[in-house]
UniProtKB/Swiss-Prot annotation:
Keywords: Disulfide bond, Signal, Storage protein, VLDL. Belongs to the apovitellenin family. Residues 1-24 form the signal peptide. This is Apovitellenin-1. One of its GO terms (biological process) is lipid metabolic process. InterPro entries: Apo-VLDL-II. GO terms for cellular component: chylomicron; very-low-density lipoprotein particle. One of its GO terms (molecular function) is enzyme inhibitor activity.
Length: 106
């Protein structure tokens, strides 16, 4: 039982999500820049599958996912991925401008 709980906690920490926020997000929303949409959806599917098999284990997952540690990790990941996304967009813009000016001569 202890190994099962450790595995469940590891999965929750890996996915870094809270279940109520998962249901409000869409995987195929092209305007979103949040890279955590896919792990959130995976966490929702895992929660739903576990909850169907054992509501008690599902409640345990829900309780663990709403702890301050998991929320803190998730907020950190959201902030860092947002920063990385912004940097990647700036890099792509610079590459595009470089191609236009140096390669195509615009």
């Amino acid at each position: 039982m202890v190994q099962y709980r450790a595995l469940v906690i590891a999965v929750i920490l890996l996915l870094s999500t809270t279940v109520p926020e998962v249901h409000s997000k869409s995987i195929i929303d092209r305007e979103r820049r949040d890279w955590l949409v896919i792990p959130d959806a995976a966490a929702a599917y895992i929660y739903e599958a576990v909850n169907k098999v054992s509501p008690r284990a599902g409640q345990f997952l829900l309780d663990v996912s709403q702890t301050t540690v998991v929320s803190g990790i998730r907020n950190f990941l959201i902030n860092e991925t947002a920063r990385l996304t912004k940097l990647a967009e700036q890099l792509m813009e610079k590459i595009k401008n470089l191609c236009y000016t140096k390669v195509l001569g615009y």
